[in-house]
């Protein structure tokens, strides 16, 4: 007797297809908005946001890679591009010369302010203006449930992870 391959049911397939398409289109639209208005890729914007959440606007490169679930080589490339634009600078870690920090510059803070304003308008237009408060709560609950399954090491802590620090204030401001 041959076993049938596992298949999604019709309702599961509709749910999956709708979720994947919605988030792909959302990603594309936000990317287009940021590129069109401030000439900044969404990925770079997300890195600037990560840096801005640190009290000193600086994180170890390894921390950026971990928080974004991105390979260190991709983070290095992105930070190099951001540094070429004058938005980020790379600094050596005082107590570990093999480690590097990425730190927002004044110009980077200005870019983040402008890009952040565009990002907020996009999020409102594509997400929050079309969802009721109840749906927004459901989306949050669903997202947290999925994140806890996909990233069990940080289960329950996804909202607070951005504030975690790996360094001392002296290292970041050096």
Q: Which residues fall in each region the model found?
A:
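N-terminal leader segment of winged-helix/HTH proteins
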Residues: 1-38, 85, 167-174
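Short, hydrophobic-biased segments on the C-terminal half of alpha helices
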Residues: 61, 79-80
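Short, locally clustered residues in the helix-turn-helix/winged-helix DNA-binding domain
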Residues: 24, 49-54, 116, 144
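C-terminal regulatory/oligomerization modules of transcriptional regulators
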Residues: 1-10, 133-174
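N-terminal helix-turn-helix DNA-binding core of bacterial DNA-binding proteins
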Residues: 28-71, 158
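N-terminal positioning helix adjacent to the helix-turn-helix/winged-helix DNA-binding module
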Residues: 11, 15, 43-45, 107, ...
